């Protein structure tokens, strides 16, 4: 009988002067890790959530559009992920958006664990209507990011458009990966941003 595959999951609590974050992530979907903070699955606080046989996703950052992007990332990467953040949104969105993506990247790296048997390089294209994005990833342990989304609006919902590339940079830095993300075409900034997160999601779907 074949040995069961190792569980690729991790949970993290991250507290700073600006944010308090709890996150749990299972790269292969399914149930969240047993040491996940129970507060993560409080349905009343989840702004972007779904539950199925293969995935559990519950995201509450306090920023609706960021919830939407992280939900898209988890869904299309095949992850189960729960994240809750209380941040200093009375100041602006910077600390919350940055710290949430640092937490996602850190937890992803922890859950992925040893890279033996995992493809080092991943890439994907993802469309959303008229928008098309490309993501290329290298599990290099040398964090580096190039992001070109061509966003023109000041904000999408309550998330500053300048923070969207920074979110991708923060994820890559914490995950210790090299990441290139480009939106190749598109008229709608919502579509451009979402297709970028979906391309990243598909690019990081590594399996043993």
From Swiss-Prot:
<keyword id="KW-0028">Amino-acid biosynthesis</keyword>
<protein>
    <recommendedName>
        <fullName>Imidazoleglycerol-phosphate dehydratase</fullName>
        <ecNumber>4.2.1.19</ecNumber>
    </recommendedName>
</protein>
<dbReference type="GO" id="GO:0000105">
    <property type="term" value="P:L-histidine biosynthetic process"/>
</dbReference>
<keyword id="KW-0368">Histidine biosynthesis</keyword>
<dbReference type="InterPro" id="IPR000807">
    <property type="entry name" value="ImidazoleglycerolP_deHydtase"/>
</dbReference>
<comment type="pathway">
    <text>Amino-acid biosynthesis; L-histidine biosynthesis; L-histidine from 5-phospho-alpha-D-ribose 1-diphosphate: step 6/9.</text>
</comment>
<dbReference type="Pfam" id="PF00475">
    <property type="entry name" value="IGPD"/>
</dbReference>
<dbReference type="InterPro" id="IPR038494">
    <property type="entry name" value="IGPD_sf"/>
</dbReference>
<comment type="similarity">
    <text>Belongs to the imidazoleglycerol-phosphate dehydratase family.</text>
</comment>
<dbReference type="InterPro" id="IPR020568">
    <property type="entry name" value="Ribosomal_Su5_D2-typ_SF"/>
</dbReference>
<dbReference type="GO" id="GO:0004424">
    <property type="term" value="F:imidazoleglycerol-phosphate dehydratase activity"/>
</dbReference>
<keyword id="KW-0456">Lyase</keyword>
<dbReference type="InterPro" id="IPR020565">
    <property type="entry name" value="ImidazoleglycerP_deHydtase_CS"/>
</dbReference>
